[in-house]
């Protein structure tokens, strides 16, 4: 069985999967795992092999040790690189800037180009590079492929991609809308076309990727024409801990009147805002319980969250001119039926009508949740970014 190894390397963790690229979107990966608490004394590796879970708790000094320990654990259970045919390694890279519009075969030169983009993604790209460096040393004889979160949005028209600031400053510092979650938005927009069995160019779709991080995209005939995240993943929708869109003047106000540093404001907007900043929690199951108990902070957070979803929905309906499908995906989008219901409530005049019974069904693969009479077909489609990355990677094998 030919498999692709998919790596998502974070600052203190590595998520990985061994994926059969021929799988369907809802098939479980052959192996999945998580290396966490890298650099901490309480490091842990969790491995899931065909439904069975195995755990190793040990200090993990760095990414190199973490990935080597994970491979050793896989070898112990007869599913390591030495026992299986790994044909390619796909790496999720958060920011490709304007340099990368498609997956790239990784070379030393490509690694340096990704490293040069660290100022655009200081929280993500350094860890992505660490994962690439480690994996290339452990598996030097298979192709390694970088798949960029931003790549799908290279098709944005200038009116959607550029900010109205001094063009020379923007050009010098790479300031523009890049968009994120691109692999997910592309995956589900392609899936809905497959489900409908229609030509890609005939379908206009609005995609909701709603997890702890959240974004939306307008996809016209297979090409992204707008998206909610911007130069960074902080922009756009209200998220679990991120503020989403705010008046930029708030940054100056906090600096001048509260004496907050840039790093403190960065931390506030990225980690202490959003639904958590408003309600104290960022888990939508907890938020729902608080709403059911009539917690006013939870109600306020939820209403602001839904308001922002509907603002972007209306904007993208205008941008596309004609909407054929709407797709919800990711943790909240796939599982929170109340979010889907409230995001699309009262839009029957625009041809959008949710079927309450279909919407209430459990998350079990792609499904239609709109009524038969709805002109716009609304779907829940589980995303599978790892499968998408695996399919890209094996093309270079």
Swiss-Prot record:
Cofactor(s) listed in the protein's UniProt record: Mg(2+); Mn(2+)
Predominant place of localization: cytoplasm
Any one GO CC term of the record: cytoplasm
Annotated positions binding Mg(2+): 8, 385
Active site, per annotation: 149
Subcellular location: Cytoplasm
GO molecular function: acetate kinase activity; ATP binding; magnesium ion binding
Residue positions binding substrate: 92
Induction details: Activated by RamA and repressed by RamB and GlxR.
Stored Pfam families: Acetate_kinase (PF00871)
Catalytic activity: acetate + ATP = acetyl phosphate + ADP
A GO BP annotation: acetate metabolic process
UniProt cross-references to NCBIfam families, sorted A to Z: ackA
Subunit structure as annotated in this protein's UniProt entry: Homodimer.
Name this polypeptide is given: Acetate kinase
Organismal lineage: Bacteria, Bacillati, Actinomycetota, Actinomycetes, Mycobacteriales
Gene for this chain: ackA
């Amino acid at each position: 069985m030919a498999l692709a190894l998919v790596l998502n390397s974070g600052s203190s963790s590595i998520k990985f999967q061994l994926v059969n690229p021929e799988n369907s979107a809802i098939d479980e990966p052959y192996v999945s795992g998580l290396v966490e608490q890298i650099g901490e004394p309480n490091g842990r590796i969790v491995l899931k092999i065909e439904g069975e879970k195995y755990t190793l708790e040990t200090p993990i000094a760095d990414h190199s040790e973490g990935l080597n320990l994970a491979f050793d654990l896989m070898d112990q259970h007869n599913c390591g690189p030495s026992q299986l045919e790994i044909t390619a390694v796909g790496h999720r890279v958060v920011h490709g800037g304007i340099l990368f519009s498609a997956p790239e075969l990784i070379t030393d030169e490509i690694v340096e180009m990704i490293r040069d983009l660290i100022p655009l993604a200081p929280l993500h790209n350094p860890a992505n590079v660490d994962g690439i460096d480690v994996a290339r040393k452990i598996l030097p004889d298979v192709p390694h492929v970088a798949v960029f979160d931003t790549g799908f949005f290279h098709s944005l028209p200038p009116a959607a991609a550029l900010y109205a600031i001094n063009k020379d400053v923007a050009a010098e510092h790479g300031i523009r809308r890049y968009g994120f979650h691109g692999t997910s938005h592309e995956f589900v927009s392609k899936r809905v076309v497959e489900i409908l069995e229609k030509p890609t160019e005939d379908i206009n779709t609005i995609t909701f990727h709603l997890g702890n991080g959240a974004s939306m995209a307008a996809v016209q005939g297979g090409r992204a024409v707008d998206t909610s995240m911007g130069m960074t993943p902080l922009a756009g929708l209200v998220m679990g801990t991120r503020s989403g869109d705010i008046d930029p003047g708030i940054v100056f106000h906090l600096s001048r009147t509260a004496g907050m540093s840039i790093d403190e404001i960065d931390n506030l907007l990225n980690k202490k805002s959003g639904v958590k900043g408003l309600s104290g929690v960022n888990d939508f199951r907890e938020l729902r319980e608080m709403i059911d108990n009539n917690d006013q902070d939870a109600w306020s957070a939820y209403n602001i969250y839904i308001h922002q979803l509907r603002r972007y929905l209306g904007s993208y309906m205008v941008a596309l001119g004609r909407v054929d499908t709407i797709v919800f995906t990711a943790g909240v989008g796939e599982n929170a039926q109340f979010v889907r219901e409230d995001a699309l409530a009262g839009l029957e005049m625009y041809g959008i009508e949710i079927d309450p019974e279909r919407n209430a069904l459990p998350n079990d693969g792609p499904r239609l949740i709109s009524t038969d009479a709805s002109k716009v077909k609304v779907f829940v489609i589980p995303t599978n970014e790892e499968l998408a990355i695996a399919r890209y990677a094996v093309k270079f094998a």
